[in-house]
Amino acid sequence: MIERVPHDLEAYVARSTAPGCFICRMLAGEPDFEHEIIAQDDAHIAFLSRWPPLPGYALAAPKAHLEGVVRDFDDAGYLAMMAFVRRLALAVEAVLGPERTYLLSLGSRQGNSHVHWHVAGLPAGVPYREQQFHALMTEHGIVPTTRESQAALARELAAAMR
């Protein structure tokens, strides 16, 4: 059973659809958009979700503001991005030992438009009815975290990505 607490979806939607890109604002160092960074290189960044529906829920994005998950990358850039996502997913698997790892790209031109991939490890033992889309929906609550627990997890994941 995954411990979850209610998530204020209305506040999240308002924040997600407000002007400005959350990833670009995070990269610019704006305090309201701070996330625990796992790893980064010249072109990519991996970080923990501030509202994780599953333990260790991480995101990976290009540093450049791209919006088309396929069309805005050239072949080399897309393959490099996918290699970075794979490294993050392997780190999630090494640290958290999930039953299954979900990879998906979400976002919309209406909000969270900066291309990013979600890397979510499904803990072992989650009943089938609570897996897949159900497990990813914050409407079912989010995993409670602290700044300290997120920082420690980011360090573990960073070590596993090396």
Q: Where are each of the predicted segments found?
A:
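HIT superfamily nucleotide-processing domains
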Residues: 1-162
